[in-house]
From Swiss-Prot:
Comp. bias (Polar residues): 104-115, 435-446
GO cellular component labels: membrane
Record bears the keyword Repressor: no
Protein name: Pheromone-regulated membrane protein 10
Compositional bias of kind Low complexity: 57-68, 136-155, 565-577, 642-652
Length: 1219
């Protein structure tokens, strides 16, 4: 048997809007069937009975309210209306104009007014227990009661207040059950008229389960219609049943007999089933309107009505509730709201450690535990949706994610703390050794932790330096000022926005017509368009700007600082704290005294902070002991007595501590007596001259009259000084670290900049030494400086490259001059070209490229000099048969004379600069003399050797045909300075050779009057032999120029194809004498097409492949032939022989075009005699030189036309390594 306790539950709500207060009191009642349905009571109750209102078809025992007036009278009770408000509501408010109606407005439901019930003060027989709901609640007990009563059809709880809001009116009312009203005449009475009823708990539980199963079936049929806008489904209605059962506080009395319970068993069951079905329908209808409040009201109202009939069914497994554990609706609502608020705060990261309302329940409260267990399921609570619209299922998931994340963060923090604790424990003894007293000031900045940090910073700086040096090793980024990785050591590229290619598409032109695909990893092939590096918007700052930035910052710091102090290694920090180790005098307030001080002191340089701090702590300890011994501190003039000699002749002890860098007795530079002994002696003298035997204190010395200069006299000031020392030292250390980092950055930038500039200069030197196309050298250098973000300008002059590195920050430039003798080395040129392409395509760094380039420059040639002499001799031997009509007997003589020329060129000339200047002239004189001597040899009346073939073949490799070609290419590429110089040099060089050939032939003619006078070979080999000699010449000329064996196939193929075209074109032209430049242009065009296709499709070095073919095409024998004719004519004229008009034109055409020899009829001999005599004059050699220039121009046009056909748009990424 369950009984209610004698204690009362009083709920007090406070409203800030109208400052009213209401108290709900639940008094003890002897009736065990008392229902706690709250209604207000008025002190002026008219006793109106509402029993005539309609009830449901089955009469259910309806609770009634007993109104207790203020004077204790108990008027007639009125049953609670279950329908809409009647007329008595308006009558009551019409008779009480000072009362106000309180309405409950919910979405989708009409406003309902409560019936007229006056408010009054209830009589209480027992004590009162007050429950104050939490302040954060969204719904008050009045609102919740209105929801329950209105939805269940029992009426509405009305909130009333007086018009005067200044006074807080306390209204107390008592709700008691009364006998159910008699049914009206028009309605039948229910099957049970008993005033109380009660069913067994087992029946209540089974009935509740049956109702849940039927309601779930109805919910499955109306799933869509029963889901509200906030995502709350029908299942929430049933999930809350377990929680809502605890609302019911109805308990039956034990006095009721089993027979009475059995008699009432059937009728209540039927009525409860109908009531449940009605509430399910109400829930579905209200859900369709989207009204969460109405849904909750309907459910809670149904549960409240069912609880009043069932006597309080509980969840399965719950224990019997006692009257002590019974909760009011306010308590349950507060507990539910508190739990939901707590969960919402946990989800939002604002977990509250206090649960409001939890103090109202005792630990042994069984029902409270059961209710709390139900409330722990966030999904089972529908009342929470009146507070927030967050679906609890999603809320739980989010809460779990947040909890997991917090747990991970907590574990991580715990690991970090553990590591820090271990590290701190490791360094604990070091810190403890320097902190021996309670007033130790600041901790030592030279801890192991800071040393480790400095080591890490040093490592980071080294990595940064390494990365800066190899910055372009990765994809080059041109940062703007807005970028996070903006480099302060850069300056805007002045010529970037004026470039004509700024808006061009960066897609590589090599992809047009690229029929082969190769990997670009080794640098020997052209990478794809993704590797293209656009021109930089910013260039690296110059060395001068970086140095000025470094020095100006130092000077700026010194000028802005009033005190310049050097610490440690003597580096000026520029930011001097006002108090450093106590070396600067301070005022009592701690401000520094502005007076001149030495910028450098030995004391601050020798000792570190540890030693200073130990000395300072020792002084503090000594002064503490001295203070304990002498409670009364002596005055300043008493120090003279302590320093005077004692009667025994022993001077009194005087404590004077001298610490390096810490001057307890401060002095300034202007004082002549800076130490304490000086003014102590002065005080002794003053005391002795007083005449009073020391009774009158001596005058205070000037050095101590200023309060600021008084020595530190108490331990507090020493402690403060020690503290300030640590702080100032840390500040200075931070400034020093910042300065060191800045210096390291600037130093690294300067080193990196110098390394890049050095690489550019080395690359320029290598390209010039190894024979890169001179008309494209400036383009190569510009591409290299662009990729390295160096602002460089280049001007090429034959034999010299002028380089200017600009600095936009200081508007200055640094001029560099690269001078070297231009040569040809095809193997090293290919290696240099690979490095150049890898750098330009951002595949390797400057450091690696510089090392590889230095290795190339230091490396020896591929073939030794003696082997090159052999190759040179063989080359001169095979060129004579196909180019100068040489015979088989002429080949050995050409090889011998060619070896002489090769020896002087390869071995002698590089070792003697003096001889190098006259090498061409001396060799031409010697070879011409020897060749005529060999040609003069006769056997049986014939000459087995040809003077013209031997002389021209021996000098073929050193003739200026390649020089003339390079000058012509430079002029064609608008390089006017280099082209003009080189072309003029080629003409003068030709005249030098002509002079040497003429002089050699004339000298031998003077010596031998029987010298040969033939300027052509009477016989020649079959033209089919040229198929053998042309590739052989290309082979040996490539080896002389240090070509690799792997490069030879392409060279031989291209040179052979070019000569074949030239041969057949010359054979089919009617007048090849006057069209030599045409045949040369067509042959050069063929070589250019094949070489550029080899570069584009095969990704090889086009220049190296084309060079032997160009050597075959260059008119090497033009100048020698004209000079030879002039030499023979002059020699014969000197000896009186006029027969010098043999087939001159035939030999000129042959040497100019390297075509088939055109035979001249003997009938034309007299016609050509005049031309021969004219060419034999000194001006004839010059005319032939100009003929050579015409042929070179034809070759130039053919090469440029071929390049235009293969590369119509040029190459933006890297320069064309072709002619």
């Amino acid at each position: 048997m369950m009984r209610t306790q004698s204690d009362e539950h009083v709920a007090t709500r406070s409203s800030s809007a109208n400052k009213q207060r209401q108290r709900v009191r639940f008094p003890k009642d002897n009736d065990p069937t008392t229902k706690r349905i709250l209604y207000p009571a008025d002190e002026n109750d008219d006793g109106h009975d509402d029993s005539d209102e309609k009830e449901t078809s089955v009469v259910i025992p309806t609770p009634s309210v007993v109104i207790v007036g203020p004077d204790g009278e108990e008027p007639a009770s009125a049953p609670i209306s279950t329908g809409s408000p009647g007329a008595d509501t308006d009558d009551y408010f019409s008779t009480h104009p000072n009362k106000k109606k309180s309405t409950l407005k919910s979405p989708g439901t009409p406003t309902t007014y409560s019936p007229s019930v006056p408010a009054g003060r209830a009589r209480s027989a027992t004590g009162v227990t007050t429950h104050t709901p939490p302040k954060g609640s969204s719904l008050s007990s009045t609102t919740l009661m209105n929801t329950l009563l209105n939805s269940s059809g029992l009426g509405q709880y009305d909130t009333e207040s007086e018009e005067d809001d200044d006074e807080d009116e306390e209204v107390t009312f008592t709700a008691r059950p009364r006998q159910p009203a008699q049914p009206s005449n028009s309605e039948e009475a229910g099957p049970s008229e008993q005033p109380q009823f009660r069913i067994d708990k087992v029946k209540s539980i089974s009935l509740m389960r049956a109702r849940q199963s039927r309601a779930r079936e109805a919910q499955e049929e109306e799933t869509v219609a029963s889901t509200d806008d906030d995502g709350v489904g029908n299942n929430d209605m049933f999930k809350i049943d377990d929680d809502a059962r605890s609302v019911s506080t109805d308990e039956s009395s034990d006095d009721e007999s089993d027979a009475d319970r059995a008699a009432r068993a059937d009728a209540p069951l039927i009525e409860r089933e109908r009531a449940s079905a009605a509430h399910v329908d109400a829930f579905a209808q209200n859900s369709e309107r989207g009204s969460n409040m109405a849904v909750g009201a309907a459910i809670m109202g149904g549960l409240a009505s069912f609880g009043s009939m069932s006597g309080g069914g509980m969840a399965p497994g719950a224990v019997d509730r006692s009257s002590e554990s019974s909760q009011t609706l306010d308590d349950q609502r507060d507990q539910r709201d508190s739990h939901l608020a707590l969960r919402r705060e946990n989800a939002l990261g604002m977990h509250s450690h206090s649960a409001p309302g939890s103090e109202d329940h005792t630990p042994g409260d069984a029902s409270g535990n059961a209710s709390a267990g139900n409330h722990d399921d966030g999904e089972d609570s529908l009342a929470g949706h009146d507070i927030n619209d967050i679906p609890l299922v999603a809320l739980d998931r989010r809460l779990e994610d947040i909890k997991e994340k917090r747990a991970e963060d907590k574990e991580k923090r715990a690991e970090d703390n553990e590591k820090e604790r271990q590290h701190h424990h490791h360094n604990h003894h070091h810190h403890h050794s320097s902190e021996t007293g309670p007033n130790t000031g600041a901790s030592s900045p030279f801890s192991e932790e800071e040393k480790d940090r400095e080591a890490e910073e040093a490592e980071i700086l080294r990595d940064q330096a390494r990365d800066l040096v190899n910055q372009h090793k990765h994809a080059v980024h041109t940062p703007d000022a807005e970028d996070e990785d903006y480099d302060p050591f850069t300056a805007p590229a002045v010529d970037y926005f004026s470039s004509i290619h700024i808006h061009d598409d960066d897609e590589d032109e090599d992809n047009h017509g690229n029929f082969l695909t190769y990997d670009a990893a080794d640098g020997s092939v052209t990478p794809t368009h993704e590797d293209y590096v656009a021109p930089p918007k910013r260039f690296k700052q110059g060395v001068l700007g970086a140095l000025l930035k470094l020095y100006n910052e130092e000077e700026g710091n010194k000028s802005t600082s009033t005190l310049a102090t050097t610490v440690g290694d003597g580096t000026s920090t520029g930011d001097v704290s006002p108090m450093l180790y106590g070396s600067e005098p301070t005022t009592p307030g701690g401000t520094p005294i502005d007076h001149p001080t030495k910028s450098k002191t030995k004391t601050t340089q020798k000792l570190g902070l540890k030693k200073k701090k130990k000395e300072l702590l020792k002084i503090i300890e000594d002064q503490r002991k001295e203070k304990e011994e002498n409670k009364k501190r002596p005055k300043w003039y008493d120090k003279s007595r302590s320093t005077s000699p004692s009667p025994g002749g022993t001077p009194a002890p005087h404590h004077h501590h001298h610490i390096p860098g810490l001057h307890l007795h401060h002095h300034t530079k202007g004082h002549q007596r800076s130490h304490s002994e000086g003014y102590l002696d002065e005080m002794e003298t003053a005391a002795g001259g007083g005449g009073d035997g020391g009774d009158k204190p001596p005058d205070r010395p000037r050095s101590l009259r200023s309060e600021a200069l008084r020595p530190v006299k108490d331990i507090k000031k020493l402690n403060k000084m020690a503290k300030n020392t640590g702080k100032n030292f840390k500040k200075r250390e931070r400034e020093l670290k910042r300065r060191r980092r800045q210096e390291v950055k600037i130093t690294v930038h300067i080193a990196e900049l110098l390394q890049r500039q050095r690489f550019i200069l080395r690359m320029c030197r290598a390209l010039m030494l190894y024979g890169a196309p001179t008309h494209r050298l400036e383009e190569y250098m510009k591409m290299t400086s662009r990729i390295l973000e160096i602002d460089g300008q280049f001007l090429y002059i034959p034999g010299c490259m002028i380089v200017s590195f600009g600095d936009a920050t200081t508007h200055t430039s640094e001029m560099q001059l690269v001078r070297c003798v231009q040569g040809v080395n095809l193997s090293k040129l290919q290696d240099t070209h690979e490095i150049y392409k890898e750098v330009v395509h951002d595949m390797i760094g400057v450091e690696e490229a510089s090392n590889r380039l230095d290795e190339i420059l230091r490396s020896k040639n591929l073939y030794p000099p003696w082997l090159c002499v052999i190759f040179f001799a063989c080359g001169t031997g095979v060129v004579s048969p196909y180019a100068f009509r040489g015979r088989w007997a002429d080949i050995p003589m050409c090889i011998i004379l060619g070896s002489v020329v090769g020896f002087f060129q390869i071995i002698v000339a590089p070792r003697s600069d003096l001889y190098n200047n006259v090498f061409e002239v001396s060799m031409s004189i010697l070879i011409s003399f020897l060749a005529r001597a060999i040609g003069t040899i006769s056997s049986g009346g014939s000459h087995p050797f040809c003077f013209a073939a031997i002389a021209q073949g021996s000098l073929a490799i050193i003739l200026p045909g390649y020089i003339v070609l390079c000058g012509s290419l430079e002029l064609q590429s608008k390089n006017i300075v280099a082209g003009s110089i080189r072309m003029f040099y080629a003409v003068i060089y030709s005249m030098f050779l002509g002079f040497g050939i003429t002089l050699g032939a004339v000298v031998y003619g003077w010596c031998d009057h029987n010298a040969t006078r033939q300027d052509k070979c009477p016989q020649q080999l079959d033209p089919l032999w040229r198929i053998l000699f042309v590739p052989l010449y290309s082979f040996f000329i490539a080896l002389v120029n240090q070509a690799r064996i792997t490069q030879l196939p392409s060279m031989l193929l291209i040179s052979g194809a070019g000569y074949t075209v030239t041969y057949f074109v010359g054979a089919n032209i009617p007048d090849p004498d006057n069209s030599s430049y045409l045949t040369s242009a067509i042959g050069a065009f063929t070589i250019g097409i094949l070489g550029n296709l080899y570069s584009r499709l095969g990704h090889g070095l086009a220049f190296a492949a084309m060079l032997p073919g160009i050597f075959v095409q260059v008119p090497s024998g033009v100048a020698s032939q004209g000079s030879l004719v002039a030499a023979i004519a002059n020699s014969n004229r000197l000896i009186g022989n006029k027969n010098v008009t043999t087939t001159i034109r035939e030999t000129i055409v042959n040497s100019a075009t390297s075509t088939v020899v055109t035979r001249v009829q003997t009938s034309l001999l007299t016609e050509t005699s005049t031309a021969a005599i004219e060419q034999a004059t000194p001006g004839g050699a010059a005319n032939l030189g100009f003929t050579m220039i015409q042929v070179a121009i034809g070759i130039t046009v053919g090469l440029f036309a071929a390049t235009l056909c293969v590369y119509p748009f040029g190459k933006k990424r890297s320069g064309l390594f072709t002619f």
